[in-house]
Swiss-Prot record:
It catalyses: GTP + H2O = GDP + phosphate + H(+). Residues 11-193 form the tr-type G domain. The keyword Nucleotide-binding applies. Coiled coil: none annotated. The gene is lepA. This is Elongation factor 4. PANTHER family: TRANSLATION FACTOR GUF1 HOMOLOG, CHLOROPLASTIC, TRANSLATION FACTOR GUF1-RELATED. The lineage of its organism: Bacteria, Bacillati, Bacillota, Bacilli, Lactobacillales. SMART domains: EFG_C. It comes from Streptococcus pyogenes serotype M12 (strain MGAS9429). Keywords: Cell membrane, GTP-binding, Hydrolase, Membrane, Nucleotide-binding, Protein biosynthesis. Required for accurate and efficient protein synthesis under certain stress conditions. May act as a fidelity factor of the translation reaction, by catalyzing a one-codon backward translocation of tRNAs on improperly translocated ribosomes. Back-translocation proceeds from a post-translocation (POST) complex to a pre-translocation (PRE) complex, thus giving elongation factor G a second chance to translocate the tRNAs correctly. Binds to ribosomes in a GTP-dependent manner. GO terms for biological process: positive regulation of translation.
Length: 610
């Protein structure tokens, strides 16, 4: 194709993604679009086709973004090339969403006709507006008995401020309105800008590792053209590679002769080292490089940290390799090696949130077959010392000595909770119990309220989401973003077994709850840790001060069994001898801590705060 033909082809390209709150029908709509454009034969069709991970199907959520090419013949008789980039809806995967939106010119905003706008719908719309995308509102599930499309249309206009007069009324499940959506994409989503004759600039928005072909890059071509045989260069580190194959996904990978401006596809170039390619980097040609890199993505900072340790210590290197491969297509995962006296060698990992942590743990166990122990999650604290230094601490065992601490600041988040009016009381009570500060609340419509609180991230990390869902019968939707660091009365609590600290059981807690929290854990551990031949004291301590204690009684042999009568001094002698033996044993004995003990600290019940 000459550059004239390529420019004509470029005018027919439409890049768009679908954004929605969880369960508003995003993956179903994607399935219908694939069927309508006959990209996938009815034989290959299955529900949630783009959610290729088993985990995504089981939980019914989208975790990874996916990009596929479709051909659509519009009513004007022209054939258009669509690139549909599927995005996750959950708050923990906002980073995935921002990456996929950067590769698009338009976004379909799916809103449930019964539930209306939810917290994450808003969060994703603001991301789309930041990227200057054309937004097409679609009101989905109009065939539900509880659907109220007119109310939702007003919500879209009032809450988001979009013109919803031309919003498509659709039902992805029943296949209603799909053609209208496709026609609107043709009319309203702009064709990609960019110059085919300019030096190559391609944005890497994802990558996967293939055991045979090395790292495969998923790219959006912004300027220029790339074909097999070209020598490409990464603009961040200058490394060069020879392109072996380029192509598109339909969802299967299909090889092509070239990828030109506006295309979304993959590039394979025998890249063997995972670290050489970074999501957000720009690819250019080595012999005709672009002057500057594309504006990439802002790096996401992890909010939640936890230690991950292999149960079998010889799996340490396998765990490192597994984490490196996961990091390849999940750029927000961070990890560094750490050691623990109780758990041996492992990694300190940073995650965007609890669901992210959960998904990574499951992927490690399923895809790489590694059994893990996770320590309790913690957040990043700013510890100000008496010599006027500020240390960032994400691991309780790194906390400085209490005598050196001047004050501690912890991260607060701005939590936006959308909830039916009848549950406002329950939400406020829960937020208050989690040390939240009320900011404001406003009514979205007659029945739904948007409540905003400032809540410490450490409280959200544990079980805020579960508690919120159970106290509102699942009706509340929740979104949060980082707000600020504030001074708090925090202390580090150590757990001592037989007088020895167990580093993996330490945690940070607010002074007010320290006594109750310590008591609960000590009692829990008493039930879990097996009895020994000697008495084992379990203590919870803040610095040198013991705040709670419980003893595991020793297993005793009845040494008097063979004394059928006889002198009391003989019995006393035997008992004294046993006592001395136990004392010696206690001095040299060590206590085995079962895995459930670490998990019990993780699943801290809220009993302390009731």
């Amino acid at each position: 194709m000459n550059s004239q033909d390529l420019k004509k082809r470029q005018e027919k390209i439409r890049n768009f993604s679908i954004i929605a709150h969880i369960d508003h029908g995003k993956s179903t709509l994607a399935d219908r679009i694939l069927e309508k454009t006959e990209t996938v034969s009815s034989r290959e069709m299955q529900a949630q086709l783009l959610d290729s991970m088993d985990l995504e199907r089981e939980r019914g959520i989208t975790i990874k973004l996916n990009a596929i090419e479709l051909n659509y013949t519009a009513k004007d008789g022209e054939t258009y090339i669509f690139h549909l980039i599927d995005t996750p809806g959950h708050v923990d995967f906002t980073y995935e969403v921002s990456r996929s939106l950067a590769a698009c010119e338009g976004a379909i905003l799916v809103v449930d006709a019964a539930q209306g706008i939810e917290a994450q719908t808003l969060a994703n719309v603001y991301l789309a507006l930041d990227n200057d995308l054309e937004i097409l509102p679609v009101i989905n599930k109009i065939d539900l008995p509880a659907a109220d499309p007119e109310r939702v249309r007003h919500e879209v206009e009032d809450v988001i401020g979009l013109d919803a007069s031309e919003a498509v009324l659709a039902s992805a499940k029943a296949g209603i309105g799909i053609e209208e959506i496709l026609e609107q994409i043709v009319e309203k989503v702009p064709a990609p800008t960019g110059d085919v004759d300019a030096p190559l600039q391609a944005l890497i928005f994802d990558s996967v590792y293939d055991a045979y072909r090395g790292v495969i890059l998923q790219v959006r071509i912004v300027n220029g053209i790339v074909k097999p045989g070209d020598k490409i260069q990464m603009m961040s580190n200058g490394k060069t590679f020879d392109v072996t194959e380029v192509g598109i996904f339909t969802p299967k990978a299909v090889g092509r002769d070239f990828l030109a401006t506006g295309d979304v596809g993959y590039v394979a170039a025998s890249i063997k080292t995972v670290a050489d390619t970074r999501v957000g980097d720009t690819v250019t040609l080595a012999n005709n490089p672009a002057k500057e890199a594309l504006h990439g993505y802002k790096q996401m900072n992890p909010m939640v940290f936890a230690g991950i340790y292999p149960i079998e210590s010889n799996k340490y290197n396998d765990l490192r390799e597994a984490l490196e491969k996961l990091q390849l297509n999940d750029a927000s995962l961070q990890f560094e090696p750490e050691t623990s006296q109780a758990l041996g060698f492992g990694f300190r990992c940073g995650f965007l949130g609890l669901l992210h942590m959960d998904v990574i743990q499951e992927r490690l166990e399923r895809e790489f077959n590694i059994d893990l122990i996770m320590t309790a999650p913690s957040v990043v604290y700013h510890v100000h010392t008496t010599d006027e230094d500020m240390i960032e601490v994400s691991n309780p065992s790194e906390f400085p000595d209490p005598t050196r601490v001047a004050f501690i600041e912890e991260p607060y988040v701005k939590a936006q909770i959308m909830v039916p009016q009848e549950f406002v009381g329950a939400v406020m009570e829960l937020s208050q119990r989690k040390r939240g500060d009320f900011v404001t609340m406003d009514y979205i419509d007659d029945n739904r309220v948007n409540v905003i609180y400032q809540i410490p991230l450490a409280e959200i990390v544990f079980d805020f989401f579960d508690k919120l869902k159970s106290s509102t019968r699942g009706y509340a939707s929740f979104d949060y973003d980082m707000s600020e660091y504030r001074r708090s009365q925090l202390v580090k609590m150590d757990i001592l077994l037989n007088g020895d600290k167990v580093d993996a059981l330490s945690f940070i807690v607010h002074k007010e709850f320290a006594y109750e929290r310590g008591k609960i854990i000590v009692e829990k551990l008493k039930k879990i840790i097996p009895r020994q031949q000697f008495e084992v004291p379990i203590q919870a301590a803040i610095g040198q001060k013991i705040v709670a204690r419980s003893d595991i009684k020793a297993l005793r042999k009845n040494v008097l069994a063979k004394c059928y009568g006889g002198d009391v001094s003989r019995k006393r002698k035997l008992l004294e001898k046993q006592k001395a033996g136990k004392k010696r044993m206690k001095a040299i004995g060590s206590v085995e801590v079962p895995q459930e003990a670490f998990l019990s600290v993780l699943s801290m019940d809220d009993d302390a705060k009731k």
